[in-house]
Swiss-Prot record:
Subcellular location field: Cytoplasm
Family: Belongs to the 5DNU family.
Task of the protein: Catalyzes the strictly specific dephosphorylation of 2'-deoxyribonucleoside 5'-monophosphates.
Family annotation (InterPro entries): YfbR (IPR022971)
Organism phylogeny: Bacteria, Pseudomonadati, Pseudomonadota, Gammaproteobacteria, Vibrionales
Assembly notes: Homodimer.
Gene Ontology terms for molecular function: 5'-deoxynucleotidase activity; metal ion binding; nucleotide binding
Positions annotated to bind a divalent metal cation: 53, 122
Any GO CC annotation of this UniProt entry: cytoplasm
Cofactor(s) it depends on: a divalent metal cation
Protein name according to UniProt: 5'-deoxynucleotidase VV1_0013
EC nos: 3.1.3.89
């Protein structure tokens, strides 16, 4: 199915309909342009799991990590909210797709390896955001970058090293350096 969907650029990558399906209209309604960069970067690693992950973040208005994990009770309750949102997102798919996409949408059914890949991609996206902001002179992201340096070191893999060494430096370039 993935090979078939790649040739339809103006269509939903999930069901190959012209953005009139539940996911296509959902993405349009909640701001595809706001999530396009993050989704693209995350989808380099794993497209379907990252799509569900980003959709849930968008619909739940993802909490900043320090807030989400400050108190274990907050984290526990937020997991319940995420689980309910996952079920809602899955139910929005046409019935004929639900079983196929269940492992990609319902985090409890995602393999440990896929969950780790999504966490890595999410950390990389946050790190790249910090690089962009710091490059633009916004020093409010300095502490977040320090925390993410630690997180990235903990989640380090050869693939992450390659991505960070090859692509991350470009996120620190100024507009003049890019042109």
């Amino acid at each position: 199915m993935l090979q078939t969907t790649l040739k339809y650029r103006n269509r939903c990558n999930i069901c190959v309909r012209e953005y009139k399906c539940c996911i296509g209209s959902f993405m349009s309604r909640f701001g595809l342009s706001n999530m396009a960069l993050t989704h693209y970067l995350t989808s380099i690693i794993h497209s379907f799991t990252s799509l569900a992950h980003q959709m849930l973040k968008r619909t739940n208005q993802d909490l900043p990590t320090p807030v989400k994990y400050y108190n274990p009770e907050i984290a526990k309750e937020y997991k319940k909210i995420e689980a309910a949102a996952e079920q809602k997102l899955l139910s929005m798919l046409p019935e004929e797709f639900q079983e196929d996409f269940r492992p990609f949408v319902i985090s409890q059914q995602t393999s440990e390896e896929e969950a780790q890949i999504v966490k890595q991609a999410d950390s990389i996206c946050a790190y790249l955001k910090c690089l962009e902001e710091l490059s633009a002179g916004n020093h409010e992201f300095a502490l977040a970058k320090k925390r993410l340096d630690i997180t990235l070191a903990e989640r380090k893999t050869p693939e992450m090293d390659y991505f960070l060494n090859t692509f991350a430096p470009s996120f620190e370039l100024s507009l003049d350096e890019i042109s």
